[in-house]
């Protein structure tokens, strides 16, 4: 009785021996913050993937008029992760810190419904 042979494939042409990298474009993502507690309660802020600044200073994208908030308190931004954009919050060495779900953070991945606290203000993160 003979052993069946496995079929053999012809060798790949030169330069095609490495696997092809498949590029995946990040899907559009919509994210925003809603001010739950603070001077602008109920206000909605759309987040830009390239970055959204938050602080007491007048040049911030999101202005929080609270003396416990630093002039340039934190920054929200997105980075591509596989096929979607992942949003982060980063504290900018603020005096009183940035908190996500009760924990002080330096840089933190954000998930839908996370609560961000800066000074006396509480904002909820939303993402589609």
Model-assigned labels for residue ranges:
Residues 1-65, 77, 81-84:
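Intrinsically disordered, low-complexity acidic Ser/Thr-rich regulatory segments
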Residues 46-127:
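Forkhead-associated
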